[in-house]
Structure formats: structure tokens, C-alpha cells
Amino acid sequence: MDLRKRDKRSVAEEKAVTGVGMRYVNVPMTGLRPPTEAEITKILTLLEDDLAGPVFVHCRRGADRTGTVIAAYRVHHDHWENRRALREAMSNGMNFIQLPRQHYIRTFRPASIHLEAAPKPSSP
């Protein structure tokens, strides 16, 4: 799952990923703000898809957008306390100036997210 905006790198990545039989998903998020409700709903829906198998989530640095998404997943799926999820994100490199993302993780409530049915995989 690529959290970067679509560009030449993501097109090349998609080709490489699908070329080895895996599924590529792009959910572009800005690096400047926490995810929207629509973005986090789509992301958690994809991460909760039992048929998807292991999922590799990344952004540019793999710390701020990725850290926020994985923290929300930890709270939602693993039933972690928000503080624990934030500590993990910070220990894995979330930038200390990412105050809006930190606030998002501290206040994220899984009950406010209504997951959709997982999308059917497309053929590579």
C-alpha cells in the first residue's frame, strides 16, 4: 500500500509489484495533515481484508504517514491504547514536529470508522 501521491515512481512500483503477482494499492495522503475519514476508512478496510495476506505499507520515509496509519490499525485491530500506538509510531521515526498526526493518534476512535466490504482484487 503506497501512501504517496501518484507519480513516475509509483507507476514503476506498481509495475514491479504486479509483475511478481502481488496487488498494488495507492491511497495518496498528503504528508502535511492526518488522514481524512475517507482515507483511513479505505486503508483500514484494506488492512482488515483477510484475503489480502500480508500488506506492506509505506510512504516516502515510512514514518509519518505510515506511522499514523499503523497506529490507527493498532488501536482499531489490536485494541491498543492510543498512547501505546503513539509511542510505537514515535519510536519508529515519526517526526516530533508532526503535532497534528500525534493529536490524531491520541484521539483516534475506532468506533467512528465504519469499514466497507473489502474490494475484490483485480487481476494483475
Regions found by a protein language model. Name each.
Residues 1-56, 68-124:
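Cys-dependent protein tyrosine phosphatase-like superfamily
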Residues 59:
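Short cysteine clusters
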Residues 62:
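Substrate/cofactor-recognition hotspot
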Residues 65:
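Glycine/aspartate-rich loop-and-adjacent alpha/beta segment that forms the canonical ThDP
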